[in-house]
């Protein structure tokens, strides 16, 4: 697959301009197509211009200049679901694979199972802190850059591959972050076990360190794959990542019994199976991305990388603020004893698992809003905003109804202890009743990212996390789990209030969306 190192040929009379998003520092680079041996700009006339062939990855992003307001949300709703459903399936694939891994490792022994649990917790914490911010920033930046490229396609020569510096920048940063994570996790495994308070004489200690050191080799492909997923999301394509994730997870499920039991590698085999599957996922995503985009563009600039780091830094701070209330809730629940903690864990796991569906709506909101906003199609952007909020509210309400009916039988799958089950069922109102609020809060996250409103997303999360954590510290000693669950509901409700306030005040990047006239066609 030979790379075609040609980009778009814009009018030489145009000056470089910012993307339609005034909050983004990404600038459009004007590069005229030229012969490899001739550095002079190519001259394109209507008679010379070859017939354009639609690119299946990007043709859907071209603006519809004949766009007319949809009287309902039918068309937008269908587009939202076409993005959200594959994304939800991809998000659900990893937890399902974790259950498969747990089942296989559990047949080795309880100490090994506990060791893997500790190691996976450490690995996932690092992943959430550094990898998820890169994923979200990549999605927004690629969507913006691709939207501008699609907007100017009428003034350009269509090439077989797109040159999008945001894709190249994210992949290079991902490789660097992945290597750094691998080194830190491998060399720091002993220190990290100390942080997790695993004593040296614990039967978990040695297998936990061994598993973490092997899993560290999978850090680079994980980060690179997430960056590639962000690029595909920027193209509004969540189906390709789904195929890649499913292929990798199927391979993992096949390799687990072979490496663990047949070859006798134990938990080392479980780690190796996971790492191999992660490299397969990264390979598939890069292979498919390379068919349409130049992966390593010579146009990578320091300023662009700095913008990634700045926005990513804000989202790392936001992730920390997000983790604090949940960590505190677990700590406070554990102080009530093992039975209370077990009931709380069932409630929390179901609550978080259901959130995958609404988190997929946030992905759709981010991709669609970033595209329309960057193109200056503000009327269409407003339709996307209202449409995704309506779909989010409908989804949350539907999930609430389903959970009210099914929470009891679903909870019984996790335990046969009547006392634990009784405690879990006392959280039905919290799990089911909070779903509409959760759905809207997650959708608002996607809307923030769609207009690169990373600063407000980060700072508001710090304030919301502080208030809800303080509430739990005061309420938990008196009201027990009810106080903890109320604090978590408050956390989500305040996120919704903050988002509604941001939209209502029409400040920051939202000012342009509400006040700017529609671009002339």
From Swiss-Prot:
Residue pairs linked by disulfide bridges in the UniProt entry: none
CDD domains reported for this sequence: MATE_DinF_like (cd13136)
Protein name: Protein DETOXIFICATION 44, chloroplastic
One Pfam family it belongs to: MatE
UniProt region (Disordered), positions on chain: 12-73
Gene Ontology molecular function: antiporter activity; xenobiotic transmembrane transporter activity
Keyword set, alphabetical order: Chloroplast, Membrane, Plastid, Transit peptide, Transmembrane, Transmembrane helix, Transport
Null mutant phenotype: No reduction in aluminum tolerance.
Location of the protein in the cell: Plastid, Chloroplast membrane
Annotated family: Belongs to the multi antimicrobial extrusion (MATE) (TC 2.A.66.1) family.
Gene: DTX44
Transmembrane segments: 80-100, 103-123, 167-187, 213-235, 242-262, 268-288, 314-334, 345-365, 385-405, 423-443, 454-474, 481-503
Bilayer disposition of the protein: Multi-pass membrane protein
Highest taxon listed in the record's lineage: Eukaryota
Transit peptide: first to last position: 1-31
GO annotation, cellular component aspect: chloroplast membrane
Tissue: Expressed in shoots.
Induction, as annotated: Not induced by aluminum.
């Amino acid at each position: 697959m030979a790379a075609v190192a040609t980009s778009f040929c814009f009018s030489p009379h145009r000056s470089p301009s910012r993307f339609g998003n005034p909050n983004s520092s990404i600038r459009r680079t004007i590069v005229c197509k030229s012969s490899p041996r001739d550095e002079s700009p190519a001259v394109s006339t209507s008679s010379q211009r070859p017939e354009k062939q639609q690119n299946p990855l990007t043709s859907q992003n071209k603006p519809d200049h004949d766009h007319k307001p949809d009287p309902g949300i039918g068309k937008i709703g269908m587009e939202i679901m076409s993005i959200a459903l594959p994304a939800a399936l991809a998000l659900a694939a990893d937890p399902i694979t974790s259950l498969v891994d747990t089942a296989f490792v559990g047949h080795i022994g309880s100490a090994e199972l506990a060791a893997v649990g500790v190691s996976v917790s450490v690995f996932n914490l690092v992943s959430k802190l550094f990898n998820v911010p890169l994923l979200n920033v990549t999605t927004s930046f690629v969507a913006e850059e691709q939207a501008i490229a699609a907007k100017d396609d009428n003034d350009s020569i269509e090439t077989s591959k797109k040159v999008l510096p945001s894709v190249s920048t994210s992949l290079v940063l991902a490789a660097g972050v992945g290597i750094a994570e691998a080194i830190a996790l491998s060399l720091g495994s002993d220190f990290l076990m100390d942080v997790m308070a695993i004593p040296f004489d614990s039967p978990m200690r040695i297998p936990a360190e061994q598993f973490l050191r092997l899993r560290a080799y999978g850090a680079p492909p994980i980060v690179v794959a997430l960056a590639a997923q962000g690029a595909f999301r920027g193209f509004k394509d969540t189906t390709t990542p789904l195929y890649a994730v499913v292929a990798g997870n199927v391979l993992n499920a096949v390799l687990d019994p072979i490496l663990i039991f047949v070859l006798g590698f134990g938990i080392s085999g479980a780690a190796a199976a996971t790492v191999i599957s992660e490299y397969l996922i990264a390979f598939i995503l890069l292979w498919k991305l390379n068919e349409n985009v130049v992966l390593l563009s010579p146009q990578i600039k320091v300023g662009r990388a700095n913008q990634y780091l700045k926005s990513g830094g804000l989202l790392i701070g936001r992730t920390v603020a997000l983790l604090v209330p949940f960590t505190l809730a677990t700590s406070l629940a554990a102080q009530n004893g093992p039975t209370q903690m077990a009931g709380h864990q069932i409630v929390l796991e179901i609550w978080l698992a259901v959130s995958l569906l609404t988190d997929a709506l946030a992905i759709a909101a981010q991709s669609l809003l970033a595209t329309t906003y960057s193109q200056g199609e503000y009327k269409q952007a407003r339709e996307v905003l209202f449409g995704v909020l309506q779909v989010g509210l409908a989804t949350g309400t539907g999930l609430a109804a389903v959970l009210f009916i099914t929470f009891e039988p679903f909870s019984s799958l996790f335990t046969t202890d009547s006392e634990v089950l009784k405690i879990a069922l006392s959280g039905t109102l919290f799990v089911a009743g909070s779903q509409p609020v959760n759905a809207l809060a997650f959708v608002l996250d996607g809307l923030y990212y769609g207009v690169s409103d990373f600063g407000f997303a980060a700072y508001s999360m710090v304030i919301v996390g502080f208030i809800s954590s303080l509430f739990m510290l005061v309420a938990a000693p008196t009201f027990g789990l009810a106080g903890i669950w109320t604090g978590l509901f408050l956390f989500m409700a305040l996120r919704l209030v903050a988002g509604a306030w941001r939209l209502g005040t029409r400040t920051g990047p939202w000012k342009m969306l509400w006040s700017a006239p529609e671009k002339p066609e």
